[in-house]
Amino acid sequence: MNARFALPLIVVATACLSACSGGEPGDAAGAKVLRNLLERAKVPAKLVSFKKTSGRGAHIGNADVYEYQYEAEVQFPEGYEAQCADEKERGPCAALGIASNRSFPKNEILRSEGMLHFSGTEKGGWIGEDGQTY
């Protein structure tokens, strides 16, 4: 094989194998998990932007876990009344990154920061808080 083509081919193959072997959850996985959590909680919202800001992996017992921090912009096309004061589990308010009751007028955009958790699979993927594999 011509040497000038060998190095780029090796770089591309390595990138493909790294991407396919699990790696860390990226922006697409995080955005999908957040959309699914909001939909499941019946929050009438549209994810306008989403960006992973940091993350860290750990090995706990026999499991790999990943803590994923993000910034997001969420729009409420029809408005929304967030009832957070009595939220006892990770529900819509946790997904939105807010802790107290709040009213969002029609089309308001919330800029929020939050955290998602993923658990590793045996095949190298990640299971998000929405129960889906990425």
Whereabouts are the PLM-identified features?
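Cystatin/cathelin-like cysteine-protease inhibitor module
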Residues: 20-134
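Sec-dependent bacterial lipoprotein signal peptides
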Residues: 1-18
